[in-house]
Protein backbone atom coordinates (compact mmCIF):
# COMPACT_ATOMS: atom_id res chain seq x y z
CA UNK A 1 0.00 0.00 0.00
CA UNK A 2 1.23 3.46 -0.83
CA UNK A 3 1.61 5.85 2.07
CA UNK A 4 2.42 9.52 2.25
CA UNK A 5 5.73 8.59 3.83
CA UNK A 6 6.67 6.36 0.88
CA UNK A 7 5.81 9.12 -1.57
CA UNK A 8 7.86 11.59 0.46
CA UNK A 9 10.78 9.15 0.62
CA UNK A 10 10.75 8.79 -3.17
CA UNK A 11 10.59 12.54 -3.71
CA UNK A 12 13.34 13.27 -1.21
CA UNK A 13 15.63 10.60 -2.66
CA UNK A 14 15.07 11.86 -6.21
CA UNK A 15 15.81 15.45 -5.23
CA UNK A 16 19.03 14.40 -3.49
CA UNK A 17 20.08 12.17 -6.40
CA UNK A 18 19.47 14.94 -8.93
CA UNK A 19 22.18 17.12 -7.44
CA UNK A 20 20.08 20.17 -8.26
CA UNK A 21 20.10 23.12 -5.92
CA UNK A 22 16.77 23.71 -4.20
CA UNK A 23 16.44 27.14 -5.78
CA UNK A 24 17.10 25.77 -9.27
CA UNK A 25 14.59 22.96 -8.86
CA UNK A 26 12.03 25.35 -7.43
CA UNK A 27 12.45 27.71 -10.37
CA UNK A 28 12.16 24.82 -12.81
CA UNK A 29 8.82 23.64 -11.36
CA UNK A 30 7.40 27.02 -10.36
CA UNK A 31 7.75 26.95 -6.58
CA UNK A 32 10.06 28.74 -4.17
CA UNK A 33 13.28 27.35 -2.73
CA UNK A 34 11.63 27.33 0.69
CA UNK A 35 8.84 25.11 -0.66
CA UNK A 36 11.43 22.59 -1.86
CA UNK A 37 13.05 22.78 1.59
CA UNK A 38 9.67 22.03 3.19
CA UNK A 39 9.32 18.94 0.98
CA UNK A 40 12.76 17.76 2.11
CA UNK A 41 11.85 18.32 5.77
CA UNK A 42 8.49 16.57 5.32
CA UNK A 43 6.59 19.67 6.44
CA UNK A 44 4.37 19.77 3.39
CA UNK A 45 3.39 17.46 0.57
CA UNK A 46 3.28 18.69 -3.04
CA UNK A 47 -0.05 18.92 -4.79
CA UNK A 48 -0.66 16.41 -7.58
CA UNK A 49 0.07 19.13 -10.13
CA UNK A 50 3.36 20.00 -8.45
CA UNK A 51 4.20 16.31 -8.03
CA UNK A 52 3.73 15.92 -11.78
CA UNK A 53 6.11 18.82 -12.45
CA UNK A 54 8.60 17.37 -9.95
CA UNK A 55 8.50 14.02 -11.72
CA UNK A 56 9.10 15.68 -15.08
CA UNK A 57 11.97 17.80 -13.74
CA UNK A 58 13.60 14.84 -11.98
CA UNK A 59 12.90 12.35 -14.79
CA UNK A 60 10.73 10.17 -12.55
CA UNK A 61 7.76 7.98 -13.36
CA UNK A 62 4.80 9.30 -11.35
CA UNK A 63 3.15 5.88 -11.54
CA UNK A 64 6.10 4.34 -9.70
CA UNK A 65 6.06 7.00 -7.00
CA UNK A 66 2.33 6.57 -6.50
CA UNK A 67 2.66 2.77 -6.75
CA UNK A 68 0.12 2.65 -9.55
CA UNK A 69 0.20 -0.51 -11.60
CA UNK A 70 0.06 -0.09 -15.33
CA UNK A 71 -2.39 -2.20 -17.27
CA UNK A 72 -0.78 -5.28 -18.74
CA UNK A 73 -0.84 -5.66 -22.48
CA UNK A 74 -2.91 -8.56 -23.68
Regions found by a protein language model. Name each.
Residues 1-20:
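A short, Lys/Arg-rich alpha-helix, primarily the initiator
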Residues 12, 23, 34, 52:
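Residues within the helices of the helix-turn-helix
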Residues 15, 26, 55:
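The alpha-helix within a helix-turn-helix
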Residues 19, 66-74:
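Short, charged recognition helix plus adjacent turn
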Residues 30-45:
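Recognition helix of helix-turn-helix/homeodomain-like DNA-binding domains
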Residues 40, 58, 66-69:
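DNA major-groove recognition helix of helix-turn-helix
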Residues 49-64:
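DNA major-groove recognition helix of helix-turn-helix/homeodomain DNA-binding modules
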